[in-house]
């Protein structure tokens, strides 16, 4: 989920209707297959929406695997700490416009597992957002909370990227301590969770608190981007202690190999060094 797209006429991509919501009722959003995808285009970029101007994903038409939105690039900051898995999967909770799936399929050899509630979103991604269909892509149409709660998923994905927003953009639709603990179990013994939050949204503090409880305060916050997104990394496994020089060296490798602004991320993280050491 990202802020509003440039002004452009929205067009429906699939039939359906919006799920009901009463703003006066303090209820949690329930995913609905009736959330209706729609499209817009501006300046060579195709955007995905759910019936509003809020952007659910984007694709550069001439280069579909490029990460157009800055926050989606930041979601890949786990590469500073882990190599892409070979046998286990990179996990994505929320498909959006398929940006992260396309990137991971092009730039890694990892299996990619996607959990997306709405089959219409998957269909739109295949029709309009050039979502590949290799054997190593596995899409589950399921509630992300139920999927991670399944004990059979334990250790399946040492990397898990979470981007779970609804059409109302009211914050992540799954954000309880239990949900994040279940995510940690999916990571297994060693792993990194990457979560997209809105730093200026009322849900932000609750998510940070719940992530801290689930991951024993082992969180890293990347700098908030101008659009308001803030990516949080949470760590599972033995404590990690590295020097700023080691992190910057790794960032150079990531930037050269994947074309991501990893050195900028690393420089921001080095400010948190204590006595010349970074602890994660």
Predicted regions and their residues:
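Short, positively charged and aromatic/hydrophobic N-terminal segments
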Residues: 9-12, 18-21
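A generic structural signal for alpha->beta connector loops
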Residues: 36, 109-111, 134-136, 190, ...
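The AdoMet/dcAdoMet-binding core of the Class I SAM-like
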Residues: 30, 42-43, 48, 63-185, ...
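Extreme N-terminal basic, low-complexity initiation segments
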Residues: 1-10
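Short, solvent-exposed secondary-structure boundary motifs
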Residues: 20-33, 210-214
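A short, flexible beta-alpha/helix-coil linker loop
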Residues: 53-57, 165-168, 193
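SAM/dcSAM-binding transferase cores
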Residues: 25-41, 55-62, 69-70, 81, ...
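C-terminal substrate-binding/active-site "lid" region of AdoMet-derived donor-dependent transferases
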Residues: 177-241
């Amino acid at each position: 989920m990202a802020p509003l797209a440039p002004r452009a006429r929205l067009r429906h991509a699939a039939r359906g209707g919006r799920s009901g919501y009463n703003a006066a009722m303090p209820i949690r959003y329930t995913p609905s297959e009736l959330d209706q995808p729609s499209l817009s285009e501006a300046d060579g970029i195709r955007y995905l929406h759910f019936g509003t101007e809020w952007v659910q994903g984007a694709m550069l038409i001439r280069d579909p695997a490029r990460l157009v939105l800055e926050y989606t690039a930041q979601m890949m900051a786990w590469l500073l700490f882990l190599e892409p898995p070979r046998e286990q999967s990179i996990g994505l909770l929320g498909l959006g416009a398929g940006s992260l799936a396309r990137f991971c399929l092009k730039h890694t050899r990892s299996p990619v597992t996607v959990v997306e509630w709405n089959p219409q979103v998957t269909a739109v991604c295949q029709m309009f957002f050039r979502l590949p269909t290799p054997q190593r892509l596995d899409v589950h149409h399921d509630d992300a909370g139920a999927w991670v709660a399944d004990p059979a998923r334990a250790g399946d994905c040492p990397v898990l990227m979470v981007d779970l927003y609804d059409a109302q953009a009211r914050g992540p639709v799954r954000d309880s301590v239990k949900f994040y603990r279940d995510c940690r179990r999916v990571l297994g013994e060693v792993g990194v969770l990457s979560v997209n939050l809105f730093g200026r949204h009322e849900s932000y503090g609750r998510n940070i608190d719940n992530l801290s409880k689930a991951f024993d305060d082992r969180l890293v916050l990347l700098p908030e981007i101008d659009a308001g997104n803030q990516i949080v990394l949470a760590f599972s496994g033995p404590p990690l202690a590295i020097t700023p020089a080691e992190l910057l060296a790794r960032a150079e490798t990531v930037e050269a190999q994947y074309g991501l602004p990893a050195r900028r991320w690393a420089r921001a993280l080095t400010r948190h060094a204590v006595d010349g050491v970074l602890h994660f």
